[in-house]
Amino acid sequence: MENKTASDYNDLPLKAPKLKGILLILFLVLLDQGTKYFAIRYLRGTSGITLIDSVLNLRYLENRGMAFGLLQNKILFLVLICIVFFMAIIYLFIKTPATFYYRPLLYTAAIVFAGAMGNFIDRVFRGYVVDFIYFSLIDFPTFNVADIYVTCGITVMVFLMFFRYKEENDFDFLKPGNRSAR
């Protein structure tokens, strides 16, 4: 019986990881849009819903900018930023080797893409992003489910780059002409 090393497992091909990533994106975007539909239907025009007194509230907000209220009413600029961001994530998704080693990167990229897509849909079809989750305990800016995807996804990507993909050649696959780093 042959002993397998960690490197052997890292090089194992994944079964349809990009299809799974696309399905994950679709599911997460639908979940985000469903929660925004709830916010529009049940929170707009009300004072909101208190889930945990003095801690967590649901309240309707139309955000015409980006995170923390930056770039208010600059929709064309925000749409262009999103398109560039989508192109970068798609490039990463296409070029990343479909191996066990890169599975966390592929799925994290899908989560970030889903969050950006959820807010992009709002900007294009509504002219604003629907936000509705408010932590009153710390007076944190109101946000939505897509924001959670982007924030958590980027955080995980940073950790991956510092702790998993720290070898010099781990991202060689992104260089022009290279097919795979491993």
Language-model segment annotations:
Residues 1-182:
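Alpha-helical transmembrane bundles and membrane-interface segments of multipass inner-membrane proteins
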